[in-house]
From Swiss-Prot:
GO terms for cellular component: cytosol; cytosolic small ribosomal subunit. Residues 1-18 have a biased composition (Basic residues). One of its GO terms (molecular function) is structural constituent of ribosome. It comes from Oryza sativa subsp. japonica. Component of the small ribosomal subunit. Mature ribosomes consist of a small (40S) and a large (60S) subunit. The 40S subunit contains about 33 different proteins and 1 molecule of RNA (18S). The 60S subunit contains about 49 different proteins and 3 molecules of RNA (25S, 5.8S and 5S). GO terms for biological process: translation. This is Small ribosomal subunit protein eS1. InterPro entries: Ribosomal_eS1, Ribosomal_eS1_CS, Ribosomal_eS1_euk. Belongs to the eukaryotic ribosomal protein eS1 family.
Length: 262
């Protein structure tokens, strides 16, 4: 039997001398700012690795997409079924300025709308806003029973469905093409388009639960900082401090210090 070192005993554990590095030590937190169309402007924070060499932190943040519930943006629990997508467009200091990048409904809300004895009608249209955004709007609506109707069901005929769908497309196209993205988003929140469709189609067949259920941005115009600042409106004013009057005691102390120095 050969006498010598037992390599297995003398060797320590592999990788035991490795230092544990905190992954957050090389990262920074940035505040996410929502457009001025929403009530709550500061919606949260996001992480990004610090600037190292050619890797710039602000470039890593741009075009990140955040999904936020409209209930949090408006401080209104009744709007919890809408999900708003916001895309990071620019970084100013520790603030990430975002813009609208789409909207959708929660699955449970959509499932709760579908019921028996009624007809579901859907429509979609591609439309361009005045500021150059190409959007695809999806609309959903349901038939309802006429006043004093005895019959349980309220199914619409195929010809009526076609007429209603035509009206949906027409109203969505008119509403979206006549305004910019900021104005259009302000129409989605109180469901202006859905109410107009209900009113316009009442002569064909009465509708209920008419919503623009989804908005997709297909194409965005070239980035313009001026337009982004317009969308954020009073963002610049928020960071400006207000002038405070100096207390009389502090003024007296300051006078004594000046006298002592002389």
């Amino acid at each position: 039997m050969a006498v010598g070192k037992n390599k297995r005993i003398s060797k320590g554990k592999k990788g035991s001398k490795k230092k544990t590095v905190d992954p957050f030590a090389k990262k920074d937190w940035y505040d996410i700012k929502a457009p001025s169309v929403f009530n709550v402007r500061n919606i949260g924070k996001t992480l990004v690795s610090r600037t190292q060499g050619t890797k710039i932190a602000s470039e890593g943040l741009k075009h990140r997409v955040f999904e936020v519930s409209l209930a949090d943006l408006q401080n209104d629990e009744d709007q919890a079924y809408r999900k708003i997508r916001l895309r990071a467009e620019d970084v100013q200091g520790k603030n990430v300025l975002t813009n609208f990048w789409g909207m959708s409904f929660t699955t449970d809300k959509l499932r709760s709308l579908v019921k028996k004895w009624q007809t579901l009608i859907e429509a979609h249209v591609d439309v361009k806003t005045t500021d150059g955004y190409m959007l695809r709007l999806f609309c959903i609506g349901f038939t309802k029973r006429r006043p004093n109707q005895v019959k349980r069901t309220c199914y619409a005929q195929a010809s009526q469905i076609r007429q209603i769908r035509r009206k949906m497309v027409e109203i969505m196209a008119n509403q979206a093409s006549s305004c910019d993205l900021k104005e259009l988003v302000s129409k989605f929140i109180p469901e202006v388009i859905g109410k107009e469709i209900e009113k316009a189609t009442s002569s064909i067949f009465p509708l209920q639960n008419v919503f623009v259920r989804k908005v997709k941005i297909l194409k965005a115009p070239k980035f313009d900082l001026g337009k982004l600042m317009e969308v954020h409106g009073d963002y610049a004013k928020e960071d400006i401090g207000t002038k405070l009057d100096r207390p009389a005691e502090d003024e007296a102390m300051a006078g004594q210090e000046v006298a002592a120095a002389e």
